[in-house]
Amino acid sequence: MKILFDFLPIVIFFVVYKMTGNIIIATAILIPATIIQVGFTWFKNRTIEKMHLVSLALVVLLGGATVLLGDGDFIKWKPTIVNGLFAIAFLGSQFIGDKNIIQRMMGDKLDLPFKVWRTLNLAWVGFFIVSGVTNLYVAFSYSEEIWVDFKLFGLLGMTIVFIILQGIYLSSHLQNKE
């Protein structure tokens, strides 16, 4: 259920764009939708994930520029910037602290060797880079409408495929441990 809630502003953006064909209007709706989403999360949990704060800041900054300047190119950069920041954070976690980000997130649930944790973390770094570059390619090589479709379905599809592949990789190491 949480994943659906996380995607709600993107879905709203998509629906408004499909109804109006106007990225400026869709972005103008995305901004308050994201603010409401983060506000609701804070009200419900009294905490906000860093990912949501980064996304909110970029939606307000790049979405605001899109609306104020009437230029949809600004909002098209958001997925690439988010993915770039995640790639930097995950890569940096390889060198800072005892555990990388993936191990911090999943280490209490899975007992894996350091090499596997490192491979998983670096795979995420690669995924974030590929996602960010692919977003830029689609955003600036294809029509706006194609990019809007890609933003919802393409990036989500890439993420699902990557998680499945990661699960297959993990299962082979979990079976070897038994």
From Swiss-Prot:
It holds the Pfam family IspA. InterPro entries: YciB. Keywords: Cell inner membrane, Cell membrane, Membrane, Transmembrane, Transmembrane helix. It is found in: Cell inner membrane. The chain crosses the membrane at residues 1-21, 23-43, 51-71, 77-97, 120-140, 150-170. Plays a role in cell envelope biogenesis, maintenance of cell envelope integrity and membrane homeostasis. Belongs to the YciB family. This is Inner membrane-spanning protein YciB. It comes from Marinomonas sp. (strain MWYL1). The lineage of its organism: Bacteria, Pseudomonadati, Pseudomonadota, Gammaproteobacteria, Oceanospirillales.
